[in-house]
Amino acid sequence: MKRYLAVAVVLITLCGSGHAVASRNVSLQKARRGVAQAPADYYPPRGDGWRRKRPEQVGMDSALLEQAVRFARTKESRIPRDFSTQVETFGALLGPLPKERGETNGMVIRRGYVVAEWGDTRRPDPTYSVAKSFLSIILGLTVDRGMIKDVHDPVRKYIDDGGYASPHNAKITWQHHAQQTSEWEGAMWGKSHDFLGVEGFGKGRREPRTLQEPGTFYEYNDVRINRMALSLLRVWRKPLPEVLKQEIMDQIGASGAWRYHGYFNSDAVIDNRRMASVSGGTRWGGGLWINTRDEARFGYLILRKGRWRNKQIVSEQWIQMATRPSAAKPDYGYLWWLNTGRKAWPSAPETSFAALGYGSNTIWIDPEHDLVIVWRWHQGSPDELIKRILAAIKPTEASR
């Protein structure tokens, strides 16, 4: 009798173990099927075929989103359409300007799909200091390729054109340039680092001050960013617009409508070839002229951490570094504006960040909500539109 009981116990145990193994196998199969069935990120094709989805298809309320778009349409920039106040505001021009700008326009990209679009989003216009964030990504490419070994390296290690020869400028690193803490001293294309004088700098002129140690003091300064752009040109040994086109814009299917202009006097001679050095904005003319749709593609590339389909265009590590708060200015990274402490956009997650330019021109990126908003030629804080768009996201659909 005891023998039969022992056999029964063994059989029950084996059956139970078999059932557990079978259950685990079924669970693993379901998990594998779940991974296989998870939708891949959508990327728009080259051209105008960017897929649209109804707001409800991506977890948004169409009525609330439409209200947000109607609000955006009412916030036309007060900047004259003909740029007639440009010299008064910024000082003497060095480069071209279009005859007039477009009207306010924008796009909302949710989970990769167009869910809202207003105004003329195909018209290329100057995007002013949004160009700085494009330069940030070019710097990232340069580091990724090993052309710059370390962002903390002194620039003078790579550049020997006299711009970093002084004891003060010799201390400047690539990171200092990218965080706008370089305190570079000198002149670029007829504009001095100190921004002194009405003729050269208009209402943007500044008062004299003592230079600080590189890396310790933040100052928004286009002359210094123009110095960084020239240094990048010398490292690449080809025009940065070519680098941008070949390495980034062509890769993400951007249109051929954008142009990155230098100044009339910003040519440099490299390898017996005359090349225009570009600027970090359109303060003195020139700069990046681009349409909203191409800016949305660029923003989507950054949202996807530098990846476009199966190609890592700029490293995820660089995107992380570029959007990390700097010590001297916690709401600024490597030429990207951050929402540290939710001070810039109180309605938005602290992890959101943006490329910003005069105008106002905005590429706002929100990884938490899988969202890109491009808004051109608007007045007021972008937060007023951001909070309305975020309100349109259904609570159960907040994240991807």
What are these regions (language model features)?
Residues A354-R400:
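Structured C-terminal helix/loop/strand segments within mature extracytoplasmic catalytic/sensor domains
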Residues R51-R52, R73, S77-P98, T127, ...:
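Active-site-proximal loop and beta-strand segments within enzyme catalytic domains
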Residues D61, G112, P126-V151, H177, ...:
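Active-site SXXK
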Residues Y4-L5, V9-V10, G18-D120, R145-I148, ...:
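N-terminal leader/targeting segments and the immediately adjacent pre-domain N-terminus
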Residues H261, S266-T282, T323-V372:
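Active-site Gly/Thr loop motif
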Residues Y113-R122, W184-F264, G286:
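Catalytic-site signature segments of enzymes, centered on catalytic residues
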Residues S133, I137, R224-S231, G286-R307, ...:
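Active-site-proximal alpha-helical segments within enzyme catalytic domains
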